[in-house]
């Protein structure tokens, strides 16, 4: 999305990750998209930020070491958090569960998810917001550290550092219930796709296409001769 006219009147605005949080926030500010998002948020539209989008939603962005743009700037001020960019980069797989959320986000409370973090900077909390989730680093299926706070929720805005947050079936269903309730629709009115199942179906189609276009008997013969 590049123009204010493309925004329309959505039920949920999702600000995704970015490699340059401060630079992209300046761009949103210059072309009027930030003002439009803030206007819709004031009218009750849900706003969710992931990673860099989460950082944008906070009160301030500080870059003392010049990791991105240098200096400091005001955030969108929808979440009571501050972000300070640091040279060290966080890269880790995580799993967790959303906390006891409030207002329009209540239906996401207590939902399990998996994903990963990859970002610069640390975010700290001001009083007033709710911790969005508790997460732990994972290796395979094992937690390797204690659960820690991640993300924030305040009124109709929320944010998280976790990429892939809505890939799980549980989170997809919870978000669907939330949006249906907000619009006064029965859950049955909207269909959803299990992304993991969909991916497996596409892999099966690809494998079948390869089998049809290749001499599988010859391939198996070569494999057997190589193992002999």
Language-model segment annotations:
Residues 1-8:
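A short, well-structured beta->alpha microelement
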Residues 54, 83, 120-122, 164-166:
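Glycine-rich beta-alpha junction loops
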Residues 26, 35, 48, 55, ...:
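Feature representing long, continuous alpha-helical segments
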Residues 19-104, 109-114:
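Cysteine-nucleophile active-site neighborhood
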Residues 148-228:
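Acyltransferase
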Residues 99-155:
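Catalytic beta-strand/loop cores that center a nucleophilic Ser/Cys/Thr
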């Amino acid at each position: 999305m590049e123009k204010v006219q493309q925004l329309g009147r959505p039920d949920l605005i999702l600000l995704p990750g970015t490699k340059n949080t401060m630079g992209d926030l300046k761009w949103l500010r210059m072309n009027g998209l930030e003002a439009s998002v803030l206007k819709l948020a004031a009218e009750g539209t849900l706003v969710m930020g992931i990673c860099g989008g989460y950082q944008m939603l906070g009160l301030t962005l500080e870059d003392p070491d010049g990791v991105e743009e240098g200096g400091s700037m005001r955030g969108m001020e929808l979440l009571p958090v501050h972000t300070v960019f640091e040279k060290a980069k966080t890269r880790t797989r995580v799993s967790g569960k959303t906390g006891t959320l409030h207002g329009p986000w209540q239906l996401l409370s207590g939902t399990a998810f998996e994903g990963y973090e990859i970002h610069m900077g640390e975010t700290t909390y001001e009083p007033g917001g709710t911790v969005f989730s508790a997460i732990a680093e994972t290796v395979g299926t094992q937690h390797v550290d204690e659960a820690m706070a991640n993300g924030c929720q305040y009124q109709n805005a929320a944010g998280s550092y976790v990429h892939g947050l809505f890939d799980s079936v549980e989170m997809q269903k919870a978000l669907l219930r939330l949006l249906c309730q907000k619009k006064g629709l029965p859950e049955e009115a909207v269909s959803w796709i299990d992304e993991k199942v969909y991916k497996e179906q596409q892999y099966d189609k690809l494998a079948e296409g390869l089998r049809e276009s290749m001499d599988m008997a010859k391939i198996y013969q070569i494999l057997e001769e190589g193992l002999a």
